[in-house]
Structures are given as structure tokens and as C-alpha cells.
Amino acid sequence: MKKLVYTAVLFALLAPLAAWSHPSIDIVASNWKFTPGTITVHLNEPATLRLTSSGGVHGIASSELGIPKTTILPNSYVTVTFTPKKLGTYEIHCAIICGAGHSDMEIIVKVVQ
């Protein structure tokens, strides 16, 4: 019984460390911009984006980074996790036509060591 209690306590103490090693990045889509406009992720490490929209329907997708087409709705959150396999700087443009400034709506993803 003591082993079970010790195991449970150890698990409870280590679980937050696992979450800390893989934090999510909050991104807000609004009319014609993403905030933040640039993010940095690490090569061969999972990255989770937590996306929401403050107005309008937007989307992201990147075959280079392995991000499937993801719709971002107002006042709700959607998460997408990907593992970058190549160093570099990538531009992700809004994947859903959202108005006059749609072509300027992008987020820069920097993949570093």
C-alpha cells in the first residue's frame, strides 16, 4: 500500500513538469493579423498552438510544418500540435478568406535548434 501512495505522490509531483516541457503558444486571430505575429518553436519538439479569434472566422494550415487546415472561430479555442522537422522561417497565411486585408494576414514561425 505504501508503494502505491508513494507512486501516486511522485506522479502528482512530476505531472506538472511534463506539461511545462511542452507549453502551448496562445495566438489570437483578428481582422487581418495574428497576435503574436512571430513565434519561435524548436526543431523535432512538439509545439502546440492554442488559437482563438477576436472577430471573424480565420484559419491556418502549413504542409511544410505539418499543420492541418484548422478553422479558428470567434470566442472559442482550438489547439493544433505539430513537430517541426526542418530548421527555417515559415510564413503561414490565413487559410480562410476573411475580407479586404486577408492577403496580408500571416504568422511567421521560426524553427530553431
Residue positions per predicted region:
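Exposed beta-strand and adjacent loop surfaces of beta-rich binding modules
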Residues: S24, P46, V57-G59, T89, ...
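Non-cytosolic beta-sheet module surface loops
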Residues: N31, L51-S53, P84
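Bacterial N-terminal signal peptides
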Residues: T7-P16
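N-terminal, post-signal-peptide region of Sec/Tat-exported proteins
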Residues: H42-T79
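N-terminal post-signal-peptidase region of extra-cytosolic proteins
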Residues: S30-G37, E64-I67, N75-T79, I92-H93
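Extracellular/periplasmic metallocenter environments
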Residues: D26, L73-Q113
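N-terminal edge beta-strand
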Residues: S21-P46
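Positively charged n-region of N-terminal signal peptides that target proteins for export
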Residues: M1-V5
